[in-house]
Amino acid sequence: MKRAFTGKILSPAHAAGFSALAVSGGLFFIREEMAVAPLALFLLFCLVAPFLPQAGFFLPVISRGARDRLAAALTFDDGPDPDVTPGLLELLDRYRLPATFFVVGVEAERHPMLIREILSRGHAVGNHSYHHDPLLMLRSRTRLSDEITRTQELLAGFGIRPRAFRPPVGITNPRLPGVLRTLDMDCITFSCRAGDFGNRLIRGLAKRILKRVHPGAIVLLHDVAPSGVRGIADWLEEVEQIILGLKAKGYEVVPLSQLIGRPVMEPATLPPSGGIPEITRGPEEK
């Protein structure tokens, strides 16, 4: 399991940068024309790393759980969707399975009853930014902070404070660590996905997931409406095949918080009685 956010200022990117400078300085006195190579390699890493959800180059990311048992966690991005999420919740109920929903703030604001339904059925909710801007990591630090904070404030109205943030499209940048440190949040990505392009490609979804699943997998799916007349029905069938396939392989579907050993969400506030608000009781517990 990749380590969670520890609040440390130095990241692998810092270490790589300092190392590149040191090696470059040494090469300058040995063979001047070679001095640029370490710096060029470092810049290449900086260009590629944002697009590697498991890399943890700019900050610690959690992309999987422990490998010591056949367990996996189901996560759903980009919702809630009034055409898709209710049927998905019924399917999860039928098999008594927990899931984590990384919700988009604007969709949560449009469909508050779906957030309440997700929570009342014992699932967890994470932060997936407010607008799901695929270019968010190219925006300013202020814009990035606003996107995450606005969603946190919105979800606090449901009695919860997500501790988990999943960046849109899984892309990170050097500004994200400071924002998450301020909000006391972890960056949680994934280790098993089907390349469904936000449910634009659902044919063979289950086959692709079951081929790539591994012990400790954080499975990425999307609860948004696919195209086509039978799109939603076909997608739900694929999700059910994933559930049945995991069971046939001996996997246990567990809450994400249990898989990674860290809280995914917590109560936003405690009522005067000191108890946990009803809407947040037993997150992800089935």
Regions found by a protein language model. Name each.
Residues 132-139, 226-229:
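A short acidic, helix-capping loop that chelates divalent metal ions and anchors anionic groups
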Residues 5, 163, 171, 177-212, ...:
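His/Asp/Glu-enriched short active-site or ligand-binding loop at hydrolase and phosphoryl-transfer sites
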Residues 77, 92, 101, 125, ...:
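Divalent metal-coordination and catalytic microenvironments
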Residues 143-148, 202-207, 233-239:
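Charged helix-capping and loop-helix junction motifs
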